[in-house]
Amino acid sequence: MLSCIICAVASAQARPFTYQEMLLLDRISGLSVDATGHYALFNVRATDMEKNKGVSALWLKDLSEPTTPERKLGVSEGGARDAQWSPDGQTIYFLSSRGEGGTAQVWKTDVSGAKAEQVTRLPLDVGAYRIAPDTKSLVVSLAVFPECTGDEIACTVKKQAERAVDKSSGEVYTKVFVRHWDTWADGTRNHLFRIAIDGSGAQPVALTPGYDGDVPSKPFGGNEDFFITPDSRSVYFSGREAGTTEPWSTNFDIYSVPIGGGPFTNLTAENKAWDASPRVSPDGKTLAYKAMKRPGFEADRFEIKLRDVAGKVATLAADWDRSVDDFAWSRDGKSLFVVAGDVGRTRLFKIDVSTGTVTALSKDGHIDAFHETPGGFVFLKSALNSPSQLYLSKPGGVIDMDPINLTAVNAKLKDLAFGAYEQFQFKGWNEETVHGFVVKPAGYVEGKKYPVAFLIHGGPQGSFGDGWSYRWNPQSYAGAGYAVVMIDFHGSTGYGQAFCDAISQHWGDRPLEDLQKGWAYALKTYPFLDGDRAAALGASYGGFMVNWIAGNWKAPWKCLVSHDGVFDARSMGFTTEEMWFEEWEQGGSVFTDPAKYDAFNPMLQAKDWSVPMLVIHSDLDYRIGVEQGIGAFTALQAKGVPSAFLRFPDENHWVLKPQNSMKWHKTVFGWLDTYIGAH
């Protein structure tokens, strides 16, 4: 059954969109709107292929004049990111490394954006920051050594200087994490500090002294991990202090601390699962935060908790079976605006604080960021046929129903052809409804058959939905002449928690059944799919599934692409960094339950591999170590299976550098063209 209206496609005369054009697109992010709703700030990242990096700039849009072009702020020339408005809307703060010493510091400018003035002059990089509502201070994060007492900053600078002159490169570790994501531990922790900016000359105040945890959390945390109260008297933050059990723990808690320093208080000690993203209501009377229920399970449902001034905690919309991604208080404090995955889309919802009533405010696509204004919403939204764009909603109703496009960024896309797409559904494992998307090739001709790229998402608790990606983008395949099929198998997010839970300890059976049934349904329903010319591709869990398919479902595939996939499940159980993930997903440790790791271990079936496979892995991938890719490639070579190994020495679990991404796509499409050739 079809569950989505077929999306429009550019005219047949338009040139197909290609991966080369995708990698050169300007990328919008970082939405910030002033308190009056007059101006919107956003970041645009251009790609400099010669320098092999992205170059970011701040842009300003006057929301009162939607048809007037946005303008680039002059201060961007020195490098500018993470812009925030002062509460009065007169000053723009941002991070830049333009000053003496090259450290990242907070700077400011006025609305003209012509001249930058340095605000902080710290000897350490500022990692994240917030402006106190009274504008007398900032709260910033700095990487310091937690064992430092007294002046943490000076002590850290001294220890770093001592390390710099040490001619030995050896590092002794006495606990894990020894490395995380793509970085080896150096003994520092992200800590919060109050920095006076009122001219008083007050020294920085440590807000988390001695805390053996990171605020913001590593590796991806930002200023969403802490919040300053409207009266500028307190700071709430989320952190995890777990000692030697840190890699096994998801027990993040919400703390409060006076902004002037003093003891910090754990407000969520009773919950041993994940508490995150503190947000205080405009009247300062209610703390909202996200919370999970099950310790050790990172993909549990995030629900909203409300804590009043008396310490009473209630769950908001307890029966709403969606997991909260981002959220913010409404201007009047009567509602929370929530972003959550929902059946292949990432939508904005409003939840009434008094009743828990949930109302959908967007209809499709992927809401990337939003901000409520007096007249509606400013938001960033992407889709399967559009990168993130800045929009202004019309008053009332659904925000993405005929919104106003506020920028001319990537205007050339209107002249390119994209593949039309639609969502479908079928009965998968346990006769439960499973959804997927099919994308036609750009320039599709009725009656013609096309080779198929069968894309398998990672996570595994993730989704290949109606949103844009610069790494796994189905439109890059459509532009190269391939049709695309993507299945949100059991374990995917946005379909309820039970659906998400179904994959744990079942990596190789329930999702595989969904993929097999989804493939059969797609072939039966869409005659333009050429089932005799098909390839399966995936990354992370998708890479695991490709390795698993190589020994369990070979028939449909002329070739395979495995990016950062698990090859040996037992080895993965010891070499990955976030142990809570492995032990939850496998149902125990390698010590206690080795048979569970072997139940879906691709290595044990490598003797049966025969389908040509391209293996891709990177040296800085500490989530799924490069040895997994080397192992898969070695097995293929030992069996005499046509194979290739693409290695990046300077990438992590994701391939991000422009030239490397270009190489990735060129290699992958060369592999596909060899075996199922769209050209």
What positions do the PLM features span?
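Hydrophobic beta-strand positions that form the internal "hydrophobic ladder"
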Residues: 40, 89-92, 138, 235, ...
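Active-site-proximal cap/loop segments of hydrolase catalytic domains
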Residues: 473, 478-479, 486-679
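Non-catalytic accessory segments flanking enzyme active sites
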Residues: 32, 139-141, 165-197, 201-207, ...
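Short beta-strand element of the alpha/beta-hydrolase
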Residues: 448-458
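Residue-level detector of Asp-centered blade-edge/turn motifs that repeat once per structural unit
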Residues: 35-36, 87-88, 133-134, 230-231, ...
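A flexible loop/linker signature enriched in serine peptidases of the S9 family
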Residues: 44-57, 73-81, 95-107, 121-127, ...
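Short loop/turn segments that connect beta-strands within beta-propeller blades
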Residues: 63-66, 110-114, 197-200, 258-262, ...
